[in-house]
Each structure stands twice: as structure tokens, then as C-alpha cells.
Amino acid sequence: MYHPHHLPAHGQVQSHQHREDAAATSSRDVNGGLSVTESAIASFRSLREKYPPKKLTRDAMRRYLKDPNDQTLIVLHAKVAQKSYGNEKRFFCPPPCMYLLGNGWKRKQQILEEEEGSSEAGQLHAFIGIGSSEQEMQQLHLDGKNFCTAKTLYISDTDKRKHFMLNVKMFFGGGGADVGQFSSKRIKVISKPSKKKQSLKNADLCIASGTKVALFNRLRSQTVSTRYLHVEKGNFHASSIQWGCFAIHLLDDDESESEEFSVVDGYIHYGQTVKLVCSNTGMALPRLIIRKVDKQTAILDADDPVSQLHKCAFYLKDTERMYLCLSQERIIQFQATPCPKETNKEMINDGASWTIISTDKAEYTFCDGMGPTADPVTPVPNVHSLQLNGGGDVAMLEVNGECFTSNLKVWFGEIEADTMFRCAEGLLCVVPDISAFREGWKWVKESVQVPINLVRNDGVIYPTNLTFTFTPEPGPRQHCPAALNILHGSKRPSASMPPTPVSGSEDDSGRGNESDRGDPIMPIKRPALDVHGRPVAPEAAATMNGANMLRTAS
């Protein structure tokens, strides 16, 4: 049977031997398990001969930017998992789900089928596990769909971890390419839902406004009857197959019903007004008051924090005791009955009782820019932020994130930048000259915006969804090779290097004042960073590794 390979540490480059071992797992036995065979290793070696590493060309990047054939893998899961004791198996609920998005999957499938001459070569196989050697990985059955669920995963009490991550292993069949191993976000292990009144001391179990949750209903505690709140074809429904992620927003009590609404920060408490918005479609339910459930009653005066795996009810605000309820696959309104003996309770049916749990997702996007590769695409780098240092000819960009390796380059649009690997969390690159993107830039006054991507040395593209904006401004042009010297290992400039002098002055609009200059006006590029529409002005000094290395005129 197939046992999981351990993922490499962030930024660690896998050895060829490890990749050969990983590729060997693509041979299948008749029982659906996997075995390592010499023929599989030989097949992987022949794959390296067939798909040698190819450096990404400018034309290939230009084609990608025009028509991205991305492959996106999403691992959707709950933030907490209930531990199983003894021989019981408390399967994760909602079950972890894997989505394959983008045209790149079908494109790669077609390429492999054509080149190998068999449909098996294009078949994608996936396995999932909890990252433990005690438990075998389970096969995920895609069956031509773009999603699948792992319905029988659990964690036993013999596993002493307080947190864990799911591992997904993917490869193409017929001795084909190993896609790689992908991790989920971190999952917290809990023993059982707390029945005590919660406090914010256990904030990691509470649910904050603006976070994502899943809601499911289980009639008479039967696992087979579990249904999940989901949006499909523009309608809310109760699905037994797919579950949806919903942003839960806290509202002011006096907030009126509207498509646009103001949200409040803080943790969700019972008795408060909330809004549930589908993360995928943006569809929202009317204003709801979340109420605590005790057996088959909704408690009207409960005000403690909502906690993981609590049962709750959703009263439709300003209605006559109407609650969000399911009836088989339909979502309906159910009218509760006042409790005759307890005025602070209303009687509801099983369909109006929902279990709430926080959710998370890990998302990976990549593209084979030069065609199929023999090496896995993992580790997939993840960019968190960009920081511009300096300006003019010496502008440098710090790329901050995780899972960086030394074989990555930063690309500005279709231009590869000189890049220096600093660590698994940081890259440093020189901002290319604006003339590389636009001819005659000296006579163009508008800004030029280009996407930022990371590219591996075998042509694999990792999009960042971030952009960089060049903003030409008038002024004398600077000439200083210090940035290239830094990257190419030349002598480091003195920390006390004086600023480059700038003749003349600028008026309030930023235009040069020609009467104060002895030289004619020449354009100067001062790149400004624009991430999601928020410009960040360049800093006057570039600080790298804690040393003030270069000053430029501001």
C-alpha cells in the first residue's frame, strides 16, 4: 500500500533521488494501492530525457500573459478536527475537499495523451492523508470532475499531535509526471465540542466576524443524513455532496436590510445580528440573528461567544419566529413555536438546527510555461508582499513570502529581472528599466503597470496576482550600477555614500522648474509600487540585510 512521502522543508530543493522515489509511486497494483518498482524509476528517468528543463523565453511569457493556462489546486477543509477514541472513527466533517480549476489541467492532459499515445498517460491520480505514517493515504476519485471529497479521514487518540496538516499527492498515470505534494493549512485537534459557556479566553475556538464558516445539518445524529449549506445555480440548497464556505459578518443591531451593509469587528456572540455571504458566488442570506440551540429549542437570551461545532439556529430578523431550515435538499423558512413553560425559548425542528465550524483553504497556482516538466511543481512559492527600495536607476524590489528556492527568478511582465535568493522567505531583484516595456517612454507621461510573476529555471510559472507600476516623472537621469553590483557579488558600496545630487527644483505638481536648472529637462523614472490599487512611495534609502547600502535623491 501507498504511504506518504514527507514534504520537504519550506524552500528546500528536493534531490533527484527523492524525485525518482516519488515518481515510482505512479505504478499501481490491482488493489488500487501503490508499489515502488524498478520500471517506474526507469520510466521517470526516461521522462527526464523526454522533458529536459527549458528556460522560459520572452515569447512564452508573452503568450502566457495573453492567455494564462493556469493550473489551480484548492484544498478546502475545516479549521478543527475532532479526535477519535479507541476503535471509533469520527470522520472529519465537513470532509476535506479538493478543487482543480483552470484550463491548464485539461491542456496538460491532452499534451501527455498525445505524446504518450495513451489515455492513461493523461489520467490524474490523487491521494490524501493526515501526514502520519500510522495511517495510509486515501485515494481521491476525480472521475472526470473538477472536485472530490475525502469522506473517511480521521485522527485517532494515539496520534498525540495538537495540530496537523493534510497532504495531497498528485501524479499523472502511465509512469507520467509527478505533479507534487501539497499541504493544507494547519488544523487544530479538539476532543469534543465544549458544552460549557464559552469565554474569549479560548479565542482560537471562537468565531470572528469576517471569517469563513461551514454549516451542516445532521438529522437524528445520523452521519448518512448530513447535508451542507451550499449555493448552486444561483440558489441556496442543502447538498449531501458539496459544502460551501460562507463569510459570517457581524452587523449593528440597527443595520437595515440592504445589498450593501456595514460590518463590525469582533467575535460572534449569540443574540447578535449576522450576515452570511457565499465566498464563491457573493450571494447573501437576509439579516439573521444567531441563537444557541439546546435540544430542540432556540434560546432567546443566550449571549456567550459562538464556538466550534456548536449547534445554532438562524432567526430571520423582523419576521414572525421564522428560522433558516432545510427540507431534504431545499432551504425553507420554518416558523418556531413559543415554549409554553420557558418564555426565553422557542421550539424548532431538527432541520433548523445547524452545526457551525470555521473553514480554511490552501490554494496553489502554477503553469508549465515551456510544456510538461519531469520535476514536481512543488514547493509552490507564495508571495505575501512587495517592498520597493530606492528609486531611479537603482530601484530594487524585495519579495516577501514563503517556499522560495534559489532557482526562482522575478519577472516584470515579459521581462526577467536580475534576482538574488536571500532565504526561503525573501528574494531581492533589480527593477528593470521602463524602456524595456514601452518604446519611446521618454515621451509618454502615463503610468505603465505590469504583473509580477515568479518563474522556475525549468519554465514553471507561479503567478502572484500582484502588479508593479512605473510612473515616469521629469528630472535628470541617474546612472549608478550599484544595484547590479550587489546582485553580481561586486564590491558593496559604502554605507555612507552621499545622495546623488539633483539640479533644479520641482513645483507642487511634481513638474521640474526649468528656470532653476542649468541643464535641459530630461525624464527620470521613479518606479512606484501599486499593489491592488494602493500606491506606495519609494523609500529614500535601500536597506538590505540591516545595512544602509545606498541612498538616492528623493
Curated annotation (Swiss-Prot):
Quaternary structure, from the entry: Interacts with activated Notch proteins.
Any one GO biological process: Notch signaling pathway
Region (Disordered), start-end ranges: 1-31, 489-554
Protein family: Belongs to the Su(H) family.
Record domain IPT/TIG: where: 381-471
Protein name in UniProt: Suppressor of hairless homolog
Listed Basic and acidic residues bias regions: 508-519
Residues in the DNA-binding region annotation: 83-90, 218-227, 291-323
InterPro entries attached to this UniProt entry: Beta-trefoil_DNA-bd_dom, BTD_sf, CLS_fam, Ig-like_fold, Ig_E-set, p53-like_TF_DNA-bd_sf, RBP-J/Cbf11/Cbf12_DNA-bd, RBP-J/Cbf11_DNA-bd_sf
Its job: Transcriptional regulator that plays a central role in Notch signaling, a signaling pathway involved in cell-cell communication that regulates a broad spectrum of cell-fate determinations. Acts as a transcriptional repressor when it is not associated with Notch proteins. When associated with some Notch protein, it acts as a transcriptional activator that activates transcription of Notch target genes. Required for the transcriptional expression of Brachyury, suggesting that it participates in notochord differentiation.
Main location: nucleus
Compartments reported by the entry: Nucleus
